[in-house]
């Protein structure tokens, strides 16, 4: 089935990529037949090549301000809405919804993932029912650690909002991340909650982990920024809140509560 054609008219689009100015020639998609909620004759977004948008399935670029180009692929029943940009080898498939977001540089988005008002860039994998929204930035970078092949992943029912998740971090299970900076090989999973606010983010880096039903919460006061570094862990039903810094080999578990601060726990030479 051929469900769309490209417009006769074209437009040039200029953009910055790693500090370099580039341009691409785009043509608009126009539906040839009725499918899903799209009617024949409806114009959609702009692409540089028919290989970008599959002629099979119900996938569609809905907004006339949305663009997809430079080796990107959109397949299955994926929906691209509002002024989104999908480019540079990004792969969007299955029942993914991309809404006013930018996806680029070989990012893979699958299953039922929703990305709204956010940026996803680099070699990463988002799948399951994950939700990324509210000006979040997912910036993958491999080769910075000994696990050079590890991909940044967000999956299962993970929820990320107002946050930066970078490098090779892992967010999964039913984890909820709000106003946080998660980097390196840090992991947040199970039913863990990481809760920053407009004043202070939570910072989790290196190989730190938050899991179980643990909560790490930022305060609104100056420096009320919980920081987990190195191999520190917050697990089970523990709560860490405020100006608390956890470093080497520290495990806060059970129903322990660390609040207020300034407080620093470090165990550089474990028994």
Label every model-predicted segment:
Residues 1-58, 64, 77, 88-89, ...:
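Terminal amphipathic alpha-helical/low-complexity segments used for targeting or macromolecular assembly
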Residues 70:
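Glycine-rich active-site/cofactor-binding loop and its immediate structural neighborhood
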Residues 73:
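Short, flexible active-site-proximal loops enriched in glycine and acidic residues
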Residues 84:
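Extended, highly charged clamp/arch subdomains and adjacent linkers
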Residues 144-149, 219-225:
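Intrinsically disordered, low-complexity Ser/Thr- and acidic-rich flexible linkers and loops
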